């Protein structure tokens, strides 16, 4: 709701510029993590004896990646918008969050130990505190740039508190060590995921950047209003999957049948949870936009009705991404994501000039569907996953599996 209030306060054009700056920064965010998150969690679960070396080396890599990413962000924004001083300032401030990525080793540790509650506490706590601060900024009539500073401060506070929680509930920082050899091993496994993560961010955020460059900041503001409602649900699959991933990995080591049963249950849950969200939002989109954002954002209604269905593919995609990690098929994940990103960019070039924001939303749906489901059919290694996802659409079979699961408990 704070994001909605900020949008109403700033208006479509200024909110569009802020959204453009955030999307631009996120476009480079994947570079700063170097594709390490899933690899590190996997190694912490499978190789607990090397945890000190894994965590210490990861922290060093994230620090280096953050610095290099920030430099890349600055160079690119000066090239893309050479005459837009405010955009350059906003991106410079928001991009500074990349410098605090090393604290994310705490997130990886908590996830590997199935105690992600600490991460949730910190993230929710910092969000609530800075939500209050942003309310004060609105009430005091502060300019656009103040919200960028607040976002940076929120990232810094979250990083500091996460580090403290890690010190209290994880290995002692003094025990961590950095190894060049271990860094090479991590990067060897993570580079496909790095490229895949970059491609993911491209096909998730490039629409806002292309709208800003091809149509204008006001169009980005209208589009971002719809996307904000559509994407507000994306924390759900991430939280659920992060909690069950270690259990799925353990099932893989003991029984392949149980492993795929757990995976099927996860697909079922992700699909119908997303449909349960998308259906009411589709029919209530105009009322939702009018109530939340006001009349000035009413053009976002048809965009929301389309874009909300991306959640179906996002929910399934988050679940299946863990399967690629467990099966060490990062290359396949990378290949399909690259294809999705290219399709998204190409379709945006075709659709945005004619259909503007509605075209961008439609392009998002098409590219997500190709990456998450359709591409599974065309590769032998992933065909089983394709049929598992398709089977999740059969509500009768889902209900039957739920009954069997309930009776076994």
Language-model segments: what does each one mean?
Residues 43-46, 99-123, 145, 308-336:
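Membrane-interface junctions at transmembrane-helix termini in multi-pass inner-membrane proteins
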Residues 3, 32-49, 112, 170-171, ...:
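Helix-loop junctions and terminal segments of transmembrane helices
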Residues 1, 21, 26-77, 89-90, ...:
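Membrane-water interface segments that mark the loop-to-transmembrane alpha-helix transition
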